[in-house]
Structure formats: structure tokens, C-alpha cells
């Protein structure tokens, strides 16, 4: 149990982010539940953590805005005095994924703004403000290994995350801070299920050797391992959590 450590989880009002917030709170972390726009859902996560005996606050911040990312850390420190863990879960994936040649500028810019710039902003803050022995955990995707048509731009944003993860781990030499990423496969969240037919969902569920979709708790458990003390020798790595899909 980490009774004195503080974790920021971005994009934590729903889905995988909410599951991570609940899991880290159960492990004893005080959790900063970041959200971009859904205050009601974020409040539900905070209330659920409190009902289970944990500590949490909700902080609105669009992490694609550098000033908002800075304020997120400021409010975490104001509430709890420190930050030990950053989980960069916030990200977007459009329900319709056109081929690269059919992708418009607005879609490209929005994906890179949230998925790359948002994580960059919070990593930059964390690099300067995390405690010795801290953890930065980013989110990639197993789609990088699959190379599926239609995912070129989305996967490119996550490829950038993997590169920054590996290099930042080296740049933080001497601080005792690890930087890793988790790359989920198909996971049963609203983000994943939106716009897909039952047949498509069934086909994707059967693709992995374990013959099911991942769950938010599967990913939250992986995150808990990577930010915990047992993974202190894992650094600069991307762990694929996809049931053996790739």
C-alpha cells in the first residue's frame, strides 16, 4: 500500500482512466482524477473512491493546453503536497478511421494535439516536478504492431509516444524516475465500441489467443504493476497488453 504517494491520471472520468483511478486508490494512492469536459462523470469516480475509503479530487484541464497541464500539477500539489505518479491516459480515437489519403487536416491536427501534445505537456511538467523514485506511464496502442489500414495517423500519434517514452527515460538519468508505456489491444470501452457492428466486435474479440476483448480492469492492473515498486527495474519500455494478439 502506498499511503503517502500521489498519482495524476489524465482522462480519468470514464473507461480505462476511471478503472486506473479506482485501482490506484485501492492501492493507497491519493488520486487526481483529471477530465477535459465531463465533470459529472469525474465526480462519480471521486465519489466512488471516497466511498471505498480512498482519497481523490477531480481537476478539469485540457492537457493539450500547456497552461492547463501546468495548472493540473499545481492543483495536485496544492491538495496533496506532491506528485509521485503520472498516468497519461487521455487520448482520442475517432469512430471513423479513414485511410491516410482520405484524412482531413482537422482530424490530423486534433489527433496530434490531444494524443501527442497533451502527453508531451504533462511529461514536461512531470520531468520537473515528480518526486525521486516517481513514475511516468504513457499510453500507446497495439495497433502499431498490427499495422491495420485506416489507423495510420492514430498509430503515428502513439508511435511518437513510444519514442518520447524511451528517450525521456534516458534524459531523467539520476532522478530515479522510470518512464514506461502500456499498449492496450482491443478493450471493451465506449471509445472502442463506438461505431462498430456486433459482428466486427465479435471478430476482434476472437482475434487474440485468449478469445476475448480486454477490460478496463485488465489495463488498470497492468498500469498498477508498472507504476508500483515491483517494476522499479523496468524503464524506457512499452508493454503490450492485448491477450497475445500481437
Predicted regions and their residues:
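The beta1-alpha1 cofactor-binding region of Rossmann-like NAD(H)/NADP(H)-dependent oxidoreductases
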Residues: 39-40, 60-72, 105, 217-218
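Conserved glycine-rich Rossmann-like NAD(P)H-binding loop of the short-chain dehydrogenase/reductase
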Residues: 27-44
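Conserved glycine-rich cofactor-binding loop
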Residues: 13-14
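Alpha-helical segment proximal to the catalytic Tyr-Lys
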Residues: 128-129, 170-174, 232
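Active-site helix of classical SDR
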Residues: 123, 157
